[in-house]
Amino acid sequence: MPDDPAAPFRTRLPEARSAPNRLADDPAPHGPAPRPAGPVLRPGVTCWRTARTGRVAVLVDGAEYFAAARAAMEQARRSILLVGWDIDPRMRLDPDRAETLDRFLTRLMRSRPTLHVRVLKWDMPFPIVLEHPHDPLERLDRSTGRRLNARLDSELPVGAAQHQKLLVVDDALAFCGGIDLSFDRWDTAAHRDHDPRRRCPNGEPYGPRHDVMMMVDGDAARALAELGRERWRRATGEAPEPGPAATEADPWPAEVPPVLTDAIVGVSRTMPPFGPPSSRNPAIRESEALTFAAIAAAKRTIYLENQYFASARIAEALARRLAEPDGPEVVLVLSMESPSWFDRMAMDTPRAVALRCLRMADRHGRLRTMTPVTEGGGPIIVHSKVIVVDGRLLRIGSSNLNNRSMGYDTECDLTIEAPDGDGDGDEGGARGGDVSAAIVGVRDRLVAEHMGVACGRLAAAVRGTGSLIAAMDRLQKPAGRRLVPLPVDDPSLTEQAFAALRIADPDRPEEAWAPWRRVPSPPRSTLRAAGAALLTVGAAAGLWGLVRRSALSRAGRGRG
C-alpha cells in the first residue's frame, strides 16, 4: 500500500507510539566483554543477526559512495528507503551535474509507476536545525505525489539522535556507514586543499572530509531493509510491505568491484529504551558489546578511525591491551580537532583525557594516535567509523567511539569476521584466506590513502616488518599528504571534570539530564572543578543559542 499523501510531515500516527519494537531482542550486556574464545559475532549479544551477502564493497569517501548510490537508485524498480541523521534534498550526488537530490528522486519516481521512495530524517532540535533545516525536505514531501514521502523521526528520548545512515534499494542492495546524503559530505580520496566542487548550496566552500560506507546485497541487504522499515514504522505508524525475494534487475553498480564475495555479515544496532512502560522498547546495545569484544579479541593490531574518541570505558579497554607485554598495536586515526566549537568543548575535551589514558598505558611503544593532513598540510576531517582487528574483523557503520553511540542514539554497524583462527595475522592472504585478505586489504587501503602512498607499497612494508606501526614509521614522509601525530595536550583539572560529566555525551537516557550521576563520588577538588565546568557550559550554551540564530543559511560542520 502506498503511503497516505496527507500523512503529517513532522508527526507520527498515534497508534504507533505504543507499538512494540518487533526487532528488539535481549539487549547486549553492559560494559566490557571478556576475551572471546570463539567468534566475536554472536547473535543476540554483539549483533542482532548474521546474514549472507553475495558481494561486499567498501566505499571510501563521499565521491565514491555518492556515485554508487546514484547508480544503484537508477536501477530501482520498487523501492528506495533513505534513513539518515541528515538528508538534504538540495545536495548533489555529482557536483559536476546540476541535478539535485530532490530532482533526482522526483525524476525516478515519475518515470517508474511502481517505485515508492521513502526518506526519513532525524527531527533535529534547536539550534542544530538552524544549520540543517527541515524546510527543503518538507517542500519535497509536499511537492510530490503519494509515492514519494519524506518524514521526520522524533521517536527517541529527548536529546537522543537518530544517527543510523542507511540506503536500501529494492530490498536487494543496501548501504550502511558514516555518510549522510547531505551537502558537505562529498569529497574525493585526493582530499585536495582547495577543490571547487566542495561547496554548500549557498556557495560556501567546505574543507576536506574522509568517510567510509559498506555496500552489501543478498540476505544482508534484506536485513537492513527490515531494520529501515521498522525505523519508518516507529516514526510514522505506517508499515511498508517487504519486497519479493527476487528482483527484476540487479541494482549493484557495475563499476564497483566487490572486495569479498559469498560472505557472512553481522548487523549490530544501538537503540535507546523508549515508549510508555506498557510497551517500552528495550535498550539495544549490540554495537557497544561488539566494540569491547573486538578490542578483547585482538592479537596483533587494532586499527581505529573515528569522528570522536570520548568514551572513557573504550579508552580503558584499549589501555588494558596496551599494558599487556605481548598485547596488540593500537593505531587511532582522528581529526586534528572537531570543526564545531561545541564539539570541541563537548567531545575534544574528553578526548584529551582518553588519549592521556592511552599514553600512560603505552609502556611498550605500541600506540600511534595520528591525524591526516592534505598536501599543503591542512587538516582533513575524519568522519569515518571503522574498526579493523588483525585480519579477523572489519566493522563499518555509524557508531562513534563516544558514550552516546553506546546507548543513547540509534546506530547501525556492519561487521565481517574471518573464520575463527584464520585472521590472527596482518598478512591477509598469506595466512587467513579470502576473508582475512579482504579485511587487511581494506585497512591497508585506508592507511595508504592517509599516508599518500600506494596501497601495495604499504602492504609490502607490513609484510616485511610484521608490524603496521613499523610499516607506517618506515613510509612516513616529512611533508605532503601524510599522517602526523596528534598534539599531546595534558587536560587541566577542570577539563578532566568536564570530561567526567560527559556534557552532551550521555551513555543512556536516564543520564541525559542528570550529569551528576555520571561521576561516582569524586573528590572535593573535582567537585569544585565540575561546578565550574557546569557554569561554563551553561554560559556557553546560552551564547550558542544567540550566535546560532545567524547560522540559518550556513552549512553545518562535522556533525552527524
Per-segment meaning from a language model:
Residues P2-G560:
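Charged, low-complexity intrinsically disordered terminal segments
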